Amino acid sequence: MDKNYIDHHWIYDIETYPSIFTFTIVRADGEYLRQYEISTRKSDQQAFAACLRYMIKNKQKMVGFNNIGFDYPVLHEIMQMLIQSKGAPCEIKAKQIYRIAQDQIASFKSGFGKTIKTEDCLIKQIDLFKIHHFDNKAKSTSLKMLEFNMRSNNIEDLPFPVGKNLTHSEMDELLAYNKHDVMETLKFYRESLEAIRFREKLSEQYGIDFTNFNDTKIGKEYFIMRLEESMPGVCYSHTPRGRKINQTKRKFIRIKDCLFDYYDFTLPEFKAVKQWFANQIISETKGVFSDIDESKLGDVSKYAEMIVKRKKFKGTPTQQDIDYFKNEHPLGWVEVEELKALETLLDSNGEPVYEISIDAKGKENKKKVKVPKKSYWGCWKEASTLNVVVDGFRCDFGVGGIHGSLSNKIVEAEEGYLIIDADVSSMYPNIAISNRVYPQHLSEKFCDIYEDVYNQRKSFPKGSAENAVMKLALNGVYGDSNNEFSPFYDPQYTMTITINGQLSLCLFVDYMKQAIPDVEIIQLNTDGCTVKIKEAYKTKYDCVCEKWQKQVKLQLEYADYKAMYIRDVNNYIALYTNGKVKRKGAYQYEGLGWHQNQSALVIPKAAEAQMLCGISIEEFIDNHMKNPDNKWDFLLRTKVPRSSRLVMILDDGTEVPLQNICRYYPSQQGGKLIKFMPALEGKEDQGERALGLETSYKVLPCNNIEDFSFNKIDLSYYYNEARKLLVGVDNIEELLDNTNIRDSEIANEEGEDYATT
């Protein structure tokens, strides 16, 4: 059995304040923990410098979390100061280090940030933040969030605001916090050992330093290496000014030039989609298949689901206003709405119209005529995404692929029926390989190398480093073909692969509709299709698959389901005939990524137990509580940026400050969780903005696990949220408007100020 550490690895972290700098380091086996302080009260500079010299002399490796972006550049500056002193007395102050740290942080605000080249690092760095791709915006994850997902006993946030001059007692607290962070980083290091060893093996095998590459980058670099071996200079040109990336940039793309010639659709819906694609000339790839006006849909408008959009005119529109509107929306129309408010009626000259009456004395009385005010709206239809509806099943098209699904439905393979899921094997790579599609500047040789990597991967056992790197290489090319910083960049390649992938799956559906009576399409996704058929038609299904595979030169892989519990295309449970379970989206509680929110996992577990096993939600949750180790499944977490503050407001209005990253659980006690954000610019007089992160339930903070108690839990929260995940129930409106804590936390992470009060 492998050790839970690698020799010569040391875990470290630094903290910087104007009055104190701390450096904590521990060997990867957990031994030899050391702390060094340079502050207004003491200086461990000599011992600290000796530690760094030991690392350099003995070729040790330092492991951190975002250390390439912060910790090491600060250490590098300190080491440069010591080197430049050439043995002469050189007293380094905490304030100097603090300024270095702030400059390092500022460098990321104004650009890509200042980092030290790998070859210039005096001590080899391993950055867990980089390895796990947490520097990607979609996966951005802090060490504190990892502490939650690692189920750490204590989650500690930075105890003092940045820039504060700390007292001696606060310095002691900072040292304890620094140690805590190092031990949590050590914990995550052990979770990351497989990834680290994988990178070490690849680096040794291929002569490329993969140490801090994320998985996607490993795949891309491996493929670039293979291309350059075969065609030197094809990815990068070397000029007197340095290395220049080779790409194919296009002013526009004629989609008809991207389409393959093997489509023989019979369904008018798919014929219309193919023709729509063929008519498009695009100059960018993002958003080109969304928010499409009815007038621009062509025949697709006969089969698409559209929404009505409205734009209010300012006052009564003139003919010029209407003409301008109709020019933008040729099939649009104007609607007039009468309001409750009244206004004076005007004649054709814009003068008030009067109602004249004669009273009993013969006196004439004039009164302005009042009529209801009117508002005028320009209305038009548009497709939020390119789509067609085939026999009640909606197929959506996009740059990311096709998708469609039944919603809020249980589909079962009753006696005499089959549910079959067919996925295309390595779809995007094989579209390129089989149809000889390649980024123009890489030449057709690209396809030969792509095919060789694909075939080579199959020769290595699953789980091997070789198999893994080749899988990463196969999958990384497509996404990078639309990355303007990549040597794979050719947006026409991107569009050729994705559009033909979608049309190919449409052809699969078309063939099934023609050959298999009463076939029910359950789901359609980027690389596959799930259907329900009568068992008697299995031979017909097999014939369709064989015909389709021959036509499009792709291979299918199959799975058989006993039942599917579908909330929507992204959230469902599939029960295989062998008893295994596939979970997606809100139902997933196993195999979650480190960047994903792992709050209140008892909720999807309880919903699954009721749907698959017939165990009521209440019974499952009550039984789950009987095991003390299950307490983690009841905990949630939230985070707010340093510019905001998090408080718990008690019934009497008392505000209890909480740390910005907070673990908690719904409780009959405690208070409401509220986030206070800074006032908007120009509206400072209105004060802070308050956002209720959860106002339907009280909560109790639980950053220290010792504060948790099953006796204080509000079980109604867990019961209610699990019920919202039940499929095939009557409360579909509530289900689709699922605003539970877990989902709202995810929304809050994606957009900090998504709601205000």
What are these regions (language model features)?
Residues 33-145:
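Conserved DEDDh/DEDDy metal-dependent 3′-5′ exonuclease domain
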Residues 69-81, 425-439:
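Short active-site loop/helix that positions an aromatic residue
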Residues 17-39, 142-145, 149:
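RNase H-like nuclease fold core
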Residues 125-127, 302, 410-428, 454-461, ...:
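Conserved catalytic palm subdomain of right-hand nucleotidyl-transferase polymerases, strongest
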Residues 3-27, 426-428:
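Gly/Thr-rich phosphate-binding beta-strand-loop-beta motif of the actin/hexokinase/Hsp70
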Residues 149-157, 164-425, 508-549, 554-555, ...:
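Conserved "right-hand" nucleotidyltransferase catalytic core of DNA-directed polymerases
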Residues 249, 297, 301-304, 313-320, ...:
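C-terminal, non-catalytic extensions of nucleic-acid polymerases
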